[in-house]
Amino acid sequence: MAYIDPTLLILLVLAGLGIISHNMTVTLAILVLLAIRITPLNSYFPWVEKYGLSIGIVVLTIGVMAPIASGKITASEVMHSFLHWKSLLAILIGVAVSWLGGRGVSLMSNQPSVVAGLLVGTVMGVALFRGVPVGPLIAAGLLSLLIGKT
C-alpha cells in the first residue's frame, strides 16, 4: 500500500475548505504551501517558518497604512480621530488588540503545543466564516489570558 503523507492530506482538506467557502485567501495560501511541500522548495520551510509571520505583518501593515500614505485619509482626519468618541474607542481597541497579539506571539513561542489548535481554529474561521488570518495571534493572546501564561 502506498504511503499517504498526513501533512499533505491536512493541507488538501484545508484547501478544500477554502474552495468550498469561496475564500481565496485560504485557498491561495494553502496551495502555495502545497507547492512548496511537494517540490524541492520544501528546503525553504525553515525560512518561511522563521520570517513568514513577520513578512505577513509587514504586508498587512502596508495595506492598512496605504490610505494614509496615499492621502485618501488626510492628516486632518487623523488628527480629528482624537476628538470623536468612536475614533477614541477604536484607538483603545487597537491598543488592546495589539497588546493581545504581543501576548499571543509570546505564548506561541513558549508553548508550541497550543499552536496546532490555534492554527486549525483560525483556518476554520477564515474558511467557514470569511474571517481573516490574523486570528492566531489574537487567539493566542486571549488564550494566554485564560490560562494565565505569557
Curated annotation (Swiss-Prot):
It holds the Pfam family DUF441. It is found in: Cell membrane. Belongs to the UPF0756 family. It is a multi-pass membrane protein. The chain crosses the membrane at residues 1-21, 51-71, 82-102, 127-147. It comes from the Bacteria. Keywords: Cell membrane, Membrane, Transmembrane, Transmembrane helix. The lineage of its organism: Bacteria, Pseudomonadati, Pseudomonadota, Gammaproteobacteria, Enterobacterales. This is UPF0756 membrane protein ECA1265. One of its GO terms (cellular component) is plasma membrane.
